[in-house]
From Swiss-Prot:
Involved pathway(s): Amino-acid biosynthesis; L-histidine biosynthesis; L-histidine from 5-phospho-alpha-D-ribose 1-diphosphate: step 1/9
PROSITE patterns, per the entry: ATP_P_PHORIBOSYLTR (PS01316)
Signal peptide annotation: none
Assembly, per entry: Heteromultimer composed of HisG and HisZ subunits.
Location of this chain's protein in the cell: Cytoplasm
Protein name: ATP phosphoribosyltransferase
Native organism: Parasynechococcus marenigrum (strain WH8102)
């Protein structure tokens, strides 16, 4: 049986739609009353593991899932050995450096050396500031990173930005983008190499559905 790791939350609905195009019905995962974390498809060909977005690449890397859907931001942050198979095109946003709108900073390089930067994505942030040759002190937060500059704990943040409304509502502004992120279909490398064709058939169906969705959108 093929196991697919699906991220609970914002990516789930579109993920289920992509797999539906491959003949895998994960619609039960969308039921708000569902409390099961492992859901087989009605046809019995596959099952879904409902996990946190950040845990998807871990389940795939360790082989507990042959396929998974996860944001590119998570892949960049965790750097686990999974195969990136398809850019699914949904869940788009950007990883950005943001500061208080009143700070006067116009770009990341304007930040003072050794200032504090708060983020859930400390690996991505470290990589970025190292590239600028700007030493900073990274403060890891698990949520509400906007409070860093608001409370004075940090000079800036590195976080995902979709519409920018949360930043604006909290008096912050994005000054530089690190990269753009979308949902990706990933696979367990060894499982892909040993595939009898069943995994590749799913991957190609998902790829075709994603291309069609991109053309329509």
């Amino acid at each position: 049986m093929i196991t697919v790791a699906l991220a609970k939350g914002a990516l789930l609905k579109d993920s289920a739609a992509r797999f539906a195009a491959a003949g895998l019905d994960f619609s039960a995962a969308l039921d708000k009353d569902n409390r099961q974390l492992m859901l087989p498809t009605p046809c019995g060909r596959a099952r879904a593991l409902l996990v946190r977005n950040g845990d998807v690449p871990t389940y795939v890397a360790y082989g507990q899932a042959q396929l998974g859907v996860v944001g590119y931001d998570v892949l960049r942050e965790h750097q686990l050995p999974v195969a990136q198979l398809v850019d699914l095109g949904f869940g788009g946003c950007r990883m950005a450096v943001a500061v208080k709108a009143s700070s006067g900073y116009e770009r990341a390089a304007d930040l003072p050396p050794h200032c504090r930067v708060a983020s859930k994505f400390t690996h991505c942030a470290r990589e970025y500031f190292d590239g600028l040759d700007l030493p900073v002190e990274l403060v890891h937060l698990n949520g509400s990173v906007e409070l860093g500059p608001i409370t004075g704990m940090s000079e800036a943040i590195v976080d995902l930005v979709a519409t920018g409304r949360t930043l604006r509502d909290n008096g912050l502004v994005a000054i530089e983008d690190l990269f753009h992120t979308t949902a990706r279909l990933v696979g367990h490398p060894l499982s892909m190499r040993l595939d009898d064709g069943s995994l590749n058939a799913i991957v190609e169906a998902v790829r075709t559905a994603s291309a069609a969705a991109g053309a329509a959108g």
